[in-house]
Amino acid sequence: MKQKLLLVALLAAFGLLAMAAPRVETISSPNGNIRIEVSIGNQLQYSVYNGDELVLKNNVLTLQMRNERFGDKPQLKGCKRSRIDEVIRPVVPMKYAVVPNKANQMSLTFKGGIGVDFRAYDNGIAYRFNINKGKKKVDVLDEGVELNFPAPFMAHISKTDTYAMSCEKPYTHISTSELQEGDQMTYLPILFESPRGTKVLFSESDVRDYPHIFLTPNGKNGFTSIFPKSPETWEPSGDRGWKITKERDCIAAQIDGRRSLPWRFAVIGDDATIAGNQMEVVLAGPCEIDDVSWIKPGQVNWDWWNHWTVWGVDFETGINNDTYKYIIDVASKFGVEYILLDEGWNKSVKDPFTTRDEINVQELVDYGRQKGVGVWLWLSWLTVEHHMDLIPYYAKMGVKGLKIDFMDHSNQWMVNYYERIVRECAKYKLMVDFHGAFKPSGLEQRLPNLLSYEGVLGLEQCAGCEPKNSIWLPFMRNAVGAMDFTPGAMQNAQPEDNWGTGSLPMGGGTRAYQMALYVCFESGLQMLADSPTRYLREAECTEFIASVPTTWDDTRILAAKAGDYYVVAKRKGEQWFIGAITGERKQPLDLTISLDFLTKPGQLTYFQDGRNAHRIAVDYKKGEQAVTPQTKLQLHLVRNGGWCGVVK
């Protein structure tokens, strides 16, 4: 009798366990290497495998709306699997003219009008929430995003203790095991490395009417999400800032009740996979501008960094028409498409219509038109917000684009500001470049008159911009979209010798390094930061820089090690450009690079570090050689060095 009772008890226990066991749904990438396991039980959580390696473990997903929370014992209604197989042709292609979008998708629907899409790509994963609440508006109080790792991973992050910042922090490199709950938060993108060396790049795309995500350590070998609240009221602060006077209790207020939230994505693979990915592109929405023929990416001579410093002329240089006509002349000589009038061209930052006495914008636009050079204007975001009529005013004058600066926030209101301004500029065929900005997150794909974003510790910071930090950019910031780094210093120095001042700036790294940045870094609007006079005196270097396209048909990552070196080849038409950079290292870098991507023989013109560039950074050597698809190039880079060339 006791045995029978024991048997009954055991059967009942196993039955309860079976009832309590979570349901697991799995989806794999087209090549089968990436696998997502979604567990639906008391919580909704997912894990990710790269082959047999677990890279993300039990990440819990929640969504807190007003008077409703999703994620506690979610009740699955349906599971639909589909295949994504399409090609995307970006209007402003940063790496590829044709981008394949191939993935397997699993769409889960739950009771309560909530769904989650999961996508498995050959090079990573993505997911997003779907809300189906009908016509009513929804307040999102919080979205729960987790990144949990099965072991200590190296984290490469940008720490911040405030949401009000321009995303220009240096990278910190630390094990997840050393991070404690309550430590500073980090903004995206963020890069992780597993004990096996697998890289995981985390970011987001298709962010609309919603804040950007920040992450904070959870003290358990991982991160959890944290978002800026949605502003309810604010007031101006000075000529370029704002003070949020009242915040709502939610991160996203009054959003459509039938919509998708942003894609969260993780690119997974080796260093080359990370640097070559197009995840932000394929997850963004399609282009929303019918006629894009007027959108012309290009290079621009920039005035602010070199402090309007030109010499050997018969006029007083500064912020005046004579200086800008000189800049236009130099731009025209080298085939640079644009010049920029940065801060200082108007009498007051607050007044976009009254120029200083020495500036006549219409005269400069007309002069530039004769020379084949377009004009861009710098403006504070606050000025644009208060004077939206400046957009048709300067468009009618013939200005080509606006550099809009100092947003320094990524809450719901500011995300909407970006889109509102870019849409308004598109109506009048004006292009846009955002400085003091957050990272790309899809808007530039939908509205491609947005050519670039800053959101990077770039050359603007002079000695604060060191190659040891910048060598991470192809694997982090520039791996998620256009990056206005503002390269091009001709006064070059190794970091210990970088004594540049505001009026006589210097650039860290060798001359060949600064030149190679034009091939290695990607931006629809690429600055030439140094003095036009220096570019004239360094004409053979300038001729190469000005020949580098800002958009590309194809990209090949030839050699890559995050934090150490990056070598890339990019094709425009029938020409291949090759760029290589390295950071601070104890020994020179020697690499053998195959040119097997060539389809026919050609002539290579190249620039490399000079014999003494490890000490005297301006030292470089120019060379030429015949090459074929069988050629093996020998690259030699000094510390903080570079190599660049073009095959014609």
Specify the residue positions occupied by each region the protein language model found:
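Bacterial N-terminal signal peptides
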Residues: 8-15
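N-terminal accessory beta-strand-rich subdomains and adjacent acidic, glycine-rich linkers
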Residues: 22-282
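Edge strands and adjacent loops of beta-rich recognition modules
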Residues: 94-100, 544-568
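An acidic-aromatic substrate-binding cleft motif
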Residues: 252, 256-330, 334
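Aromatic- and carboxylate-enriched substrate-binding clefts and catalytic-loop regions
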Residues: 341-510
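Catalytic cores of secreted or luminal carbohydrate-active enzymes
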Residues: 512, 516-558
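Carbohydrate-binding surface patches
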Residues: 561-599, 643-644
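C-terminal beta-strand-rich structural cap/linker in extracellular carbohydrate-active enzymes
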Residues: 624-648
